[in-house]
Amino acid sequence: THKSIPYAMYLKAYSYYERMPDVNLDQKLSDRAVKEFSELINKYPNSKYAKKSMSHLRSLKNHLASREVKIAKFYQSQGYFLASIKRYKSVLREYKKSTHIPESIFRLIECYISLGLVKQSFYFYKILEYNFPKTEWAEESEKLIKDNKINLNLKKFKKKQLDLKSLKAEDFDLI
């Protein structure tokens, strides 16, 4: 392989990254940038472009998570709680390191409360409280749980049931 291949791959991926559209628009270019940066990282993990690619990949994934949250909030505002739950859970599954995780968990609590699903809302409350204890979302969720008179002693959870690092994508399908 030629020594310039990682650079060429980086330029190709970056050209898609630079044209990343607003979250309201189609995300084909963002998806393509994710694919190209991922391929570069996998093929040339020790190249100097891999580190830059990882940084861009984090930014892209956060952007895509933002889009999912925006769509989910729209569904939620229209009363389509199951559709919004599906979107919020996809953020938890697909964008684990996104800055949108705490808000997605909070919105899941809201949706489950709206559907009258107390156990699910409480479980996500505990996940939020465990993983993001000192955030505005944790404070808001505690208020939401109390305002809806959800019994805070409903169930004791083990650490592995709450830690987002331990939970697998399919675990969210069970909740």
Label each residue range with its predicted role.
Residues 1-175:
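Acidic, polar-rich low-complexity tracts and alpha-helical solenoid repeat scaffolds
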